[in-house]
């Protein structure tokens, strides 16, 4: 297993990246190339900082005061082994975890769903920006609650 992930940044406090006040950890790299993406500057793989899963957990533990974390990017699902390892460590520390992906719900592996509490899905579509969803950039994106690995309902 690859225990080094490509990392873009960390925000200690955000009210826009999932339910409640959360911290946000950004994976580096995304091949979706959504026109108008607000994180396009972190899309090209190979340009991010390489850190170990252990270093990522230490960074999150030090900066996330309320145990609510959103994993975003880039596209976290493009580093699946590293994502699983990080989510497993965070779950073991009782974090409330939200995963942001530009993919559809069916692209989120079951073993990833087992490790998270929320998932935001959908590509950013600039023509669908309407401001109705506080957790997404366009109206085709949705936030779902996940309970025991099962998607239970759409939150937004």
Give the predicted meaning of each segment.
Residues 6-33:
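N-terminal pre-triad scaffold of radical SAM enzymes
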Residues 15, 110, 133-135:
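Short secondary-structure boundary/capping segments
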